[in-house]
A protein has these predicted regions:
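Bacterial N-terminal signal peptides that target proteins for export
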Residues: 1-11
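N-terminal secretory/targeting leader peptides
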Residues: 26-117, 125-336
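N-terminal signal peptide c-region/cleavage motif recognized by signal peptidases
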Residues: 20-22
């Protein structure tokens, strides 16, 4: 009888002893993204996850789910907000569905070079925008920087050296206001097509052209069905690694720091690798002989066409946000 009465107490004591072993201290974070195994991004995300597990002594495990296993990029972002997902790596334009001002770093012809862009994205001019993401959507950055590259135009046969050369051409764009307004500003017809259908659309001449970073143009073999590559460098593509704020706050400070440090290390390695790939893959495209490369299109003429585009999008981004970013760019340039 006494044994029966003491059984709950024994179970409680055993459970407490089990928890005291530290098993309960193990935390698993789920990291969903859109890239495929074998791509640089996925390989670095996996390396990031492995380093976190190793350096935390097994206290923290990051499980990586590639290839849109958990949903498309926009879906992953919503899961990140709700806490159904812990970590993801959206592009800045994807974030515009939550905070439209995140489109600004992708504004055409905004940046002189990557160094300038990186400093502003990390700096105080963008801080209120990151704060809005945190306060309204429960999301914070592990790294604000994940260099993807400068986007360039490709076309079937048309040699595009100046905006007037694009008049009337159908150009594939992501379904995002900044891309639509940009292509329209050049006098072409923006045509939203899902990324997975771009190669077929080019091959079947559903559209005349598209734009992407060099590593994408090469790895997706767009250059095989496009006869012209115009090195417009019109837009910077930067991604991020973000974490659900509640997931982050549940971790001990030393584990929070570990995540941030390892994300920064992966980001730095990615920047170095991707910039090297831009150079080597452009050379591979050149050597293929399948694509004529226009190395020096009239970038000033293209940039001039973007002034009214900025005016149209300023209210979407927030006038104060846009003024603050432009002022920081001007300050940096005048200091040189």
């Amino acid at each position: 009888m006494r044994l029966t009465r003491s059984l709950p107490a024994m179970v409680t004591a055993l459970l407490a002893a089990f928890l005291a072993t530290g098993v309960s201290a193990q935390t698993v974070l789920r990291f969903g993204h859109a890239n495929s195994p074998g791509e640089v991004a996925h390989d670095l995300y996996k390396e990031f996850a492995d380093n976190v597990t190793k350096k935390s002594g097994g206290q923290l495990t990051v499980r990586v789910f590639p290839s849109e296993q958990l949903g498309k990029e926009v879906d992953l972002l919503q899961q990140l907000k709700s806490g159904a997902l812990d970590i993801s790596s959206p592009s800045m334009p994807t974030l515009n569905s939550m905070v439209p001002a995140f489109e600004m770093p992708s504004a055409p012809f905004l940046w002189k070079d990557w160094k300038e862009a990186e400093a502003v994205i990390r700096g105080p001019a963008m801080e209120p925008i990151w704060t809005e993401l945190k306060d309204k959507h429960n999301i914070v950055p592990l790294t604000k920087i994940w260099y993807w590259g400068w986007r360039n135009f490709t076309f079937g046969t048309k040699e595009v050296r100046k905006p007037e050369d694009m008049a009337g051409l159908k150009v594939r764009v992501p379904e995002s206001p900044i891309w639509v307004e940009m292509v329209r500003g050049f006098g072409a017809a923006p045509t939203p097509i899902p990324f997975g259908e771009v190669y077929t659309a080019l091959q079947q001449k559903t559209v005349d052209g598209q734009e992407n970073p060099i590593p994408t143009i090469f790895s997706r073999k767009f250059y095989e069905v496009q006869g012209v590559l115009s090195m417009s460098r019109h837009m910077l593509q930067n991604n991020t690694i973000l974490i659900n704020k509640s997931s982050m706050e549940k971790l001990k400070p030393e584990l929070q720091k570990l995540l941030i440090d390892e994300a920064a290390a992966a980001s730095a390695k990615n920047s170095e690798m991707q910039q090297a790939r831009e150079v080597s893959m452009l050379e591979d495209i050149r050597k293929s002989g399948k694509t004529r490369i226009i190395d020096n299109p009239d970038r000033d003429a293209f940039a001039a066409k973007m002034v009214p585009v900025y005016v149209r999008l300023e209210s979407r981004w927030g006038t104060e946000n846009w003024k603050r970013v432009r002022a920081e760019i001007d300050r940096m340039r005048s200091a040189k």
